[in-house]
Amino acid sequence: MDSTDKAFLLLADGSFFEGQAIGARGKTIGETVFTTGMTGYTETLTDPSYYGQIVTQTFPLIGNYGIIKEDFESRKSWVKGYIVRELCEMPSNFRCQSSLETFLKEEGIIGIAGIDTRALTKKLRNSGVMNGMIISGREIDQFTKDGPQKYLEIIKSYKIQNALQAVQSRAVDGGTVLEARGTDPSHSSQFTGGQTPNSLGTDPAAPKNKNFHVALLDFGAKANIQRELEKRGCKVTLLPYNTKAHTILELTPDGIMLSNGPGDPAENTDVIEEIKQICEWNKEQMKSLPEKAIAIFGICLGHQILALARGAKTSKLKYGHRGGNHPVKESESGRVYITSQNHGYAVENQNLPAFARQSFVNLNDGTCEGLIYTDIPAFSVQFHPEACGGPHDTNFLFDNFLKLMENKNASK
């Protein structure tokens, strides 16, 4: 990293930061957010939920263990830009395959280091997330010539669009089934550093080797969701985000997983309508043939889309929840869990439908972190129980999903 290679960060409110260029050179625009994770930057960079965003790492030193491809959450990086206080140039880790700087260049990610990330984080916390632009390389001369006003107009007009379509794990084919995978005993150890499922928090009492069939709707699914299901013996069919309700039901899965993903959940009206149809079908089955009902589990964006399909509302948070240290309380037991989170929207917990019960609440701001639906076999959480590079406190929710599927199968 050349200390003389300048980079600028310009925010929509006119705030200006000068630092050192990292990664690729050029200019990039996105929604500027911050994450409080001390580790897990590989997972952050490859998490599709960060699509369209410039990510600020609040921890002052990033990159000290390098890049490990086995820890990727998807096939590539999705961030629009990357901001760190200090980038480690000499990583040390027996699993390290490249430096963070090398990865950023290979992925074409434009970044900036050496700025006061604490001041930037305070600004975003007090004013809310805002659009920004990172400028480096040859673009510096053009910026100096034109002045910031021209760029501010572009920055303010930026909006994340077509997010779900952009982050598909594989090519979308009009709602066609993309992939079906079963359990590979070597698959779990490959992606968990050789740890056994129990060492990652799997409930020993949870049903195992049941070969449950789970339809995973890919809204930008993190790889660890599929890994957690597969290591519990599930056969996973990965489906495009726009798969029709009738196509999903024709697969006769034991369970439906609604994945994480980027963007404003309320904009996905077509997807919400398909999930609504599945829930209505489930509701009818519960009246006449409850053994045919399908268990549903939603995570993050999946939690929000399920809530919208059931009549709840969502709203944008001032600066979101991003990082691996967010405390949530389970409503029934009062127990507190530390969770990994990455979202800018939340389900409004006022005026929830009568059949929706809040199961978890955020202890920092009181927002809804989970819902249980009493009229159909469905539940969802706002946080990430599958988190790697984060806490495993709520990993048991995957076991709860298996138990829900087993309860449905026991009555057949």
Predicted regions mapped to residue ranges:
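Proline-centered loop/turn at the N-terminus of a beta-strand
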Residues: 110, 213, 295-297, 313, ...
